[in-house]
Amino acid sequence: RPLNDQHHELPSMQNELQEAAPEAPATTKGWFNRTVAGAGLTSALGDFCYETTTVILPGFLAVLGIPAAALGIIEGIADAVASFTKMVSGYIADKLGHRKSLVLVGYTLTPVGQVFIALAAGWPLLLLGRLVSWFGKGLRGPLRDAIVIQAVSPQTRGRAFGFHRAVDTIGAVIGPLLGVAVLGWAQSLHWDDAAGPFRFVLWLSVIPGVLAVLAFLALVKDPEHSPNPGLRLWSTLRGLPGRFKRYLGAVGIFGLGDFSHSLLILGATQLLTSSLGVVQAAQVAGLLYVGRNVVQVVASYPIGAWADRIGSLPLLVVGYALGALTAVLMVLAFWFHTASVPLLAGVFVAAGLYVAVQEALEST
């Protein structure tokens, strides 16, 4: 399932879930501050880095001669690693008392993973690169969200996270657009093999990944926290409120049916190849994915503001229903061998809407 970004970034256990954690009243905390802005900029740069890979990865696998099924296996294993990391990252941060340092490590691992992918000549390095990147994403996400949560009031969390996810997705729009454009330009140059243009784009994508680390280091402030070396993971999990455990169960059930949206790109490419040819089909599929990210960035802030008024739960239910609809529509597209760009665009729009709900509200 997607971690784009896209992915279940829950707050640090002790700092966010225990009612004893102090929260300033709404009158003393505005939702737009240096921490929210810095976290948003950092996420935008991080998304620029790895979403560029997402949009060209299916084509990269094709020129390397790696079967399409390998993409599903690689993404599935990487998502599993990210999910496990998210579960324990809050515990580790509370035990050590260093949230910001761990977030910086997480952001550093994204460009490191990109380097492995750029060097890959087969599936092992691709898998290693994805594992490193998604481990970093799983490590940083919950802790970054916990920092943002403590920087705003409870009454404005929806708006803060809606803004954060919107800025985050701007990077996810610009990155793939530039990636597709640079890929088209690079193909006109002389390369030793067909993978050369793809490697060139992957190397360029490392730059915003490094800038993300510097932005978080310079802009985001996190109060010092006392380490808790006696904290135990399983006793902490057992002590979580029953309502939160039920929420985690629901999120986990949805996660079992969720899937990486790299597979949407791959599926659209396969469906359109018969009518457009593989190169043009891959370009159109990449643009459809950019459209999905545009839908997400446009919808994120309004969804967060709406959740502040009516509550997050009803909108999360709608978002999960849209996620199920997206999967059903893609299955039907393959069942009927749909090669219609407008119909496939509808699938990507539904995907953008449900990810906007998921990303903006799950952490609040």
List each model region and its residues.
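C-terminal ends and interior cores of transmembrane alpha-helices
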Residues: 108-121, 321-338
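C-terminal membrane-cytosol helix-exit motif in multi-pass small-molecule transporters
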Residues: 206-226
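Transmembrane alpha-helix termini and helix-breaking/packing motifs in multi-pass membrane transporters
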Residues: 59-63, 174-196, 267-271
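Helix-loop boundary and gating motifs at the non-cytosolic
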Residues: 25-82, 245-288
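Residue-level signature of mid-helix packing/kink "hotspots" within the transmembrane helices
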Residues: 51, 79-87, 172-173, 293-301
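Helix-to-loop junctions at the C-terminal end of transmembrane segments
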Residues: 85-98, 183, 298-312
